[in-house]
């Protein structure tokens, strides 16, 4: 069954790669290129999963995640944060604001696909 996945990232090459991978996995994909448009897309489309970059213009991934977790209507949306920031404090902050999982860039597409399947199955 096809799931709705929102890719929220401002880096074009990452978006192309993630979009290809998620479509290959059979998901319906939409894209947001900054924090405010990501939040708007989450509120209107209610995706099953958001691949959320931490460092984006307008609002950070942390701020977007916090806003989503503060909205009961969006409780079912899974969030996988993606970031080049891999320090323990960054990971703890991402999970602390409500992300379901956190992966650091660069990541293997195999690991990402497995994590997405795991999150969508739960």
Question: How would you name each of these model-derived features?
Answer:
Residues 45-51:
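Active-site beta3 strand of CheY-like receiver
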Residues 32-36, 91:
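Conserved Asp/Asn-Gly motif in the active-site loop of CheY-like receiver
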């Amino acid at each position: 069954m096809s799931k709705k996945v929102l890719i929220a990232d401002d880096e074009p090459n990452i978006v192309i790669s993630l979009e290809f991978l998620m479509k290959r996995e059979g998901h319906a994909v939409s894209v947001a290129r900054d924090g405010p448009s990501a939040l708007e897309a989450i509120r209107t489309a209610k995706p099953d999963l958001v691949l959320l970059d931490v460092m984006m213009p307008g609002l950070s991934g942390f701020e977007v995640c916090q806003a989503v977790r503060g909205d009961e209507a969006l409780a079912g949306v899974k969030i996988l944060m993606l970031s080049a920031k891999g320090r323990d404090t960054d990971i703890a902050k991402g999970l602390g604001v409500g992300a379901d999982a956190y992966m650091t860039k660069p990541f293997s597409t195999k690991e990402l696909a497995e994590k997405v399947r795991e999150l969508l199955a739960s």
